[in-house]
């Protein structure tokens, strides 16, 4: 009888917090705990001695009641179910002691619900128990079950049963059709506690899967029905389909139930969870667990959570489920700490707890989870798993195996947590107060919750596939069935934020259970999918030759920053994480600035002008140009002065653009150049880099550190020696030039410190020719005549002059100033100042593009991608004004001559870019060659062989880029051209006759129709 009684208890519909004892086959149906008001499980047991199942149920109810003090509706419901379950009265195996109830303890625990409904359930359970005791007639059970199921349906959206990976019954599976539900509930209840004699009236809860029960299926196959949330059985031979368990299988199931209550197909036993621990703290709760053979498996789902948490019990609320469950296992010190923590958390969480009685405290929940884990260990893990599988037959046997594995994992995790708890580290399990601050980190919280749920998943695991899929949604909010689960997730999130544990405890038992398994599965599935997609994409990129080696670290930083900001705006990224990453990026740039700045100089950011300026630490003088440390000071100073003047002028023309580009380019390029050429190349490379850097660094524009107002001297006034920047060239020309410049530079990356100079210069020459020829040619040709001379002079004097060649109509010597300003300024300045000065209105948009292009080109150069295009745009844009600046900048970096380009060519830097400015239609190759030779000499002295290799590769890449600029460049160029064309049309008055500028008349549709008809006629 012991076995039988065990099975019977397992059968009990009540999923109250039963002692950890194995619960026979508690129907997974009784989700609602049946804590009775009865204080002692013992009392309950005696009252139900006739049918041990009834007794068990009563005991469970009593225990629950005791813990709850007032029976909850759920409990009452559970009680009602009990009669159904207790059709065959087993001996009152349930001792008052939780241990006695062990058979159903786990299930009861899981089933125990902390809802106000529990009390009602208790009452109904008691009634049901009395009925069971009297006759336990199948009819009574049927009617009770029907009522119970109806109640459950009303109370909770049906939750598909998932195999209880851990001994917790799955959340209520979706209700099968009313008839089926009633019968299945009956059957499960009966099966748990039925005697073999009851076979006639015995019914199996079809919501529970037979997988894992270990019965021979023969010709029958179990099929899950999503609509009803139940399984139906299909005879593969006869093609017969039945909602009820076929006799062939029913006989086996009944036999199993009697012999292995814990593995009862009802899997109700899984509810037995850790009732013992629970019972110790709450004897009543434990008792309810014992009586845990809640019949209604659906309720069981709820009950499982409730039972597990039985948080509704006032005692638990005071004490905490964790305390109740773990009391026997945990040392006093830990208990006290938990108690203190719980009190703290409860105050904060009470509203949340109210939201979900089930989750009295997250801490409790966590603790409960641990006890459950322990209980699972105490209880028969295999049996629990079997029960879970049975109860949660919503999943295939395969899944059940997974559940078993998961259960084991969960148990392991819980054990570890328990150990940590014992060590006093409550935070591990999460029972310790969680950072209430984690709300912003709700994602982290969710992750933690999910992990916790993973633990709970043991119990929830059995949810039917449907429920699993639903639960899989992180919060389960997506599905009504998971209503509870969703709430649990939500609550758990809140709790996580407030006190991970408290909410989780109550709420998570049921909801988390349901969701945990699905979530764990979902997480694993998600991880798998992510890994698959990531591997595929990575492999494709690799095959296509797209790798990080082709771009600089700063490019990566820029893209990462942009992506993170976009994700953050979408709410998919933690703000604190983003802030930390942005700070890291800012720090990287800061290091770059420090390394790039020549000795004796400090680099500062001017927020107003959005560009760098440099302060001589000895003299305290400040300047926009990048100081050329390697060039002779005089040369560098002269160039810097000129550059400064030009830059300032250009800045005046378009301060905003210049500052933006200067900032980023100077920061990124300046430092790079400085590093490699100790400031020689800094201007040139910085300038090209600037535009892109601005974006990449996002630090500069987005996170630019405020310019130290007092420490750095104010940016130097633009020197007056350099001629004022020529008026902006015609918008079309300017736009084109800028576009070209931007395109080329945008595609390039800042060259490596060693190679920066050469690469930018060479690519710029090539690029300049190509791109500048395209759009700049017209403008350059016009400006080249005027600036050609200047450029020639500069080129001759400084290879840089070539760049300053007159790409823009007006030569912008801003190169030096822009360069000095900072490569960001230079970068932006190149386009903005070089071209921008020429065409300030057009240059602003173009400048922005140019910056990107330039940055890109520098980057490409740096990465070996599109150095040439960047340089080209560089040369083009700055040819008139900017050429000097661009070429000067690169040269400056190398020779610090750029400023001289337009105004007074300083001594030609050894590595001036060989390519003539595109606008001038390429200065004589001789000059370029000379410049290149100079550069080569410098590079030889400055650069290692690797750098040379890199530079040669860059040149090749630049040539390629020249032929086809990057998409970005193309887009920006096209946009610029359109804008320039619009400006031209408007300025020239052509717009009046251009239909593109006409406002669409209201009858435009009719007009369009007429037009279409005209050609036909």
From Swiss-Prot:
Biased composition (Basic residues): 449-458, 929-941
Compositionally biased tracts (Acidic residues): 627-637, 733-748, 957-970
Biased composition (Polar residues): 130-141, 428-442
Acetylation as UniProt keyword: yes
Residues found modified as N6-acetyllysine: 290
Gene3D superfamilies: 2.20.70.10
UniProt region (Disordered), positions on chain: 1-141, 160-202, 421-519, 621-676, 706-792, 899-994
Skewed-composition ranges (Low complexity): 40-69, 181-200, 461-474, 657-671, 764-786
Residue span, WW domain: 214-248, 595-629
Domain of life according to the entry: Eukaryota
Name of the molecule in the record: Formin-binding protein 4
Ranges annotated as biased composition (Pro residues): 706-732, 904-925
């Amino acid at each position: 009888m012991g076995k039988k009684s065990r099975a019977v208890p397992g059968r009990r519909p009540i999923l109250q917090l039963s002692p950890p004892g194995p619960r026979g086959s508690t129907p997974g149906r009784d989700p609602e705990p049946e804590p009775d008001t009865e204080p002692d499980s013992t009392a309950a047991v005696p009252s139900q001695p006739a049918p041990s199942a009834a007794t068990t149920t009563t005991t469970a109810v009593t225990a629950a009641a005791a813990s709850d003090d007032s029976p909850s509706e759920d409990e009452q419901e559970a009680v009602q179910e009990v009669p159904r379950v207790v059709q065959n009265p087993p001996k009152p195996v349930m001792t008052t002691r939780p241990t006695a109830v062990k058979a159903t303890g786990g299930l009861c625990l899981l089933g125990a619900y902390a809802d106000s409904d529990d009390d009602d359930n208790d009452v109904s359970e008691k009634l049901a128990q009395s009925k069971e005791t009297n006759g336990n007639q199948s009819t009574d059970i049927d009617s009770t079950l029907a009522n119970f199921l109806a109640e459950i349906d009303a109370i909770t959206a049906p939750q598909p049963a998932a195999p209880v990976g851990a001994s917790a019954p799955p959340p209520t599976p979706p209700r099968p059709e009313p008839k089926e539900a009633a019968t299945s509930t009956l059957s499960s209840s009966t099966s748990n506690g039925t005697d073999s004699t009851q076979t006639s009236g015995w019914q199996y809860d079809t919501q529970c899967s037979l997988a894992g029960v270990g019965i021979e299926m023969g010709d029958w196959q179990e099929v899950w029905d999503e609509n009803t949330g139940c399984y139906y059985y299909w005879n593969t031979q006869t093609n017969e389909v039945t909602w009820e368990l076929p006799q062939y299988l029913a006989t086996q199931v009944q036999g199993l139930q009697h012999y292995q209550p814990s593995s009862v197909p009802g899997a109700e036993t899984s509810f037995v969870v850790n009732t013992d621990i629970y019972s110790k703290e709450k004897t009543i709760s434990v008792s309810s667990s014992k009586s845990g053979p809640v019949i209604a498996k659906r309720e069981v789902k709820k009950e499982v959570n409730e039972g597990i948490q039985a948080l509704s019990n006032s005692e638990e609320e005071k004490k905490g489920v964790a305390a109740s469950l773990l009391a026997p296992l945990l040392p006093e010190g830990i208990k006290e700490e938990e108690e203190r923590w719980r009190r703290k958390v409860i105050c904060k969480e009470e509203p949340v707890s109210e939201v979900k009685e089930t989750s009295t405290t997250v801490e409790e929940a966590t603790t409960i989870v641990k006890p459950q884990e322990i209980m699972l260990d105490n209880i028969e893990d295999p049996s629990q798993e079997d029960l879970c599988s049975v109860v949660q037959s919503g999943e295939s046997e395969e899944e059940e195996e997974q559940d078993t594995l998961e259960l084991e994992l969960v148990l392991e995790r819980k054990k570890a947590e328990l150990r940590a708890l014992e060590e006093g580290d409550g935070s591990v399990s999460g029972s310790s107060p969680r950072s209430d601050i984690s709300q912003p980190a709700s994602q982290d919280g969710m992750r933690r919750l999910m992990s916790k749920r993973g633990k709970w998943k043991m119990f929830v695991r059995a949810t039917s596939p449907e429920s699993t899929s639903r639960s899989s949604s992180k919060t389960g909010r997506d599905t009504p069935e998971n209503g509870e689960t969703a709430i649990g997730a939500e609550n758990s999130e809140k709790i996580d934020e407030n006190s991970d544990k408290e909410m989780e405890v109550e709420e998570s038992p049921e909801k988390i259970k349901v969701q945990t398994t699905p979530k764990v599965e979902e997480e694993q599935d998600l991880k798998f999918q992510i890994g698959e997609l990531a591997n595929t994409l990575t492999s494709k990129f690799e095959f296509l030759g797209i790798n990080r080696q082709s771009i600089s670290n700063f490019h990566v930083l820029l893209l990462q920053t942009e992506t993170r900001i976009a994700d953050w705006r979408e709410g998919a990224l933690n703000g604190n994480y983003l802030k930390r990453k942005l700070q890291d990026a800012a720090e990287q740039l800061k290091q770059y600035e420090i390394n790039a700045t020549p000795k004796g100089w400090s680099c500062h950011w001017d927020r107003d002008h959005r560009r760098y300026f440099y302060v001589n630490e000895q003299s305290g003088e400040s300047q926009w140009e990048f100081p050329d440390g390697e060039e002779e000071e005089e040369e560098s100073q002269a160039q810097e002065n000129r550059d400064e003047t030009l830059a300032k002028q250009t800045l005046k023309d378009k301060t905003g653009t210049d500052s933006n580009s200067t900032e980023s380019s100077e920061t990124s390029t300046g430092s790079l150049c400085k590093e490699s050429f100790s400031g020689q190349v800094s201007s040139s490379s910085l300038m090209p880099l600037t535009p892109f850097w601005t974006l990449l660094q996002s630090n500069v524009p987005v996170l630019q550190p405020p310019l130290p107002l007092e420490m750095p001297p104010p940016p130097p006034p633009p020197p007056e020696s350099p001629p004022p920047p020529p008026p902006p060239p015609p918008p079309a020309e300017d736009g084109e030039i800028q576009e070209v410049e931007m395109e080329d530079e945008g595609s390039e990356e800042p060259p490596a410190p060693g190679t920066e100079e050469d690469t930018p210069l060479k690519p710029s020459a090539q690029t300049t020719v190509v791109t500048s020829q395209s759009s700049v040619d017209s403008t350059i040709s016009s400006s080249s005549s005027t600036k050609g001379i200047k450029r020639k002079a500069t080129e001759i004097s400084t290879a840089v002059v070539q760049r300053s060649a007159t790409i823009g109509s007006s030569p912008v010597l801003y190169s030096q100033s822009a360069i000095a300003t900072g490569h960001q300024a230079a970068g932006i300045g190149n386009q903005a100042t070089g071209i921008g000065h020429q065409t300030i209105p057009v240059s602003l948009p173009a400048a922005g593009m140019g910056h990107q292009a330039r940055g890109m080109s520098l980057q490409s150069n740096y990465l070996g991608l599109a150095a040439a295009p960047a340089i080209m745009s560089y040369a083009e844009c700055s040819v008139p004004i900017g050429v000097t600046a661009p070429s000067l900048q690169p040269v400056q970096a190398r020779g610090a001559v750029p400023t001289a380009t337009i105004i007074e060519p300083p001594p030609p830097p050894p590595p001036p870019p060989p390519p003539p400015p595109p606008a001038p239609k390429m200065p004589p190759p001789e000059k370029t060659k000379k410049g290149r030779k100079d550069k080569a000499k410098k590079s030889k002295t400055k650069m290692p062989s690797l750098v040379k290799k890199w530079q040669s590769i860059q040149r090749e890449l630049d040539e390629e880029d020249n032929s086809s600029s990057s998409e970005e460049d193309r887009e920006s160029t096209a946009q610029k051209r359109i804008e320039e064309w619009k400006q031209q049309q408007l300025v020239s008055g052509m717009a009046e006759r251009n239909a593109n500028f006409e406002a669409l008349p209201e009858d435009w549709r009719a007009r369009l129709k007429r037009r279409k008809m005209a050609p036909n006629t």
